[in-house]
Amino acid sequence: MTEIQEKLLEALSASLKGESVEWEPLSQEELSELYNLAHIHQILPLVYEAVYKSQGVNPQVKAISMRAAMTQALSTRDFLQLVSKMNEAKLYPLVVKGIIARKLYPIPDERVSGDEDLLITKELFPTYHQFFTEHNLVTGDDLEPYEVPYQLKGSSLYIELHKTLFQEESVAY
């Protein structure tokens, strides 16, 4: 593990405890690598929150971090509204990963999620597909895979509708 990878884990750990790291100043190159790695793993807001007090404010990283957290908050709002509409329609998918995992973080919207995952039975897929298309969610033409992606028009909300939890063809499961 590289020194920057170790610092990433240290910053994430501090963030989860609501603390800041206390490091000697890192070089601009090291900070860039740290923030890049955090961005790749979708934890930039968490890492930046723990790091900026000891390393100084980086306006560009701060803006990216804040934008990511705000976008996540809007996606969460859109998702919760969609779930409410599903419940009104007597549709009750199992929510897995995403919003559930974010509840483990002190500030859930700082843990960016690329998508929300819903698990349904294969038999109910046509019902959910119809509901989604009637509620401004779009997808591609291939509806056969074990998971079908949907994007809410005008939103960053991206949903993967799973017909099974794992790929049946996968040798890992």
Give each language-model segment a name.
Residues M1-G114, I120-Y173:
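Conserved NTP-donor binding/palm subdomain of two-metal-ion nucleotidyltransferases/polymerases, i.e.
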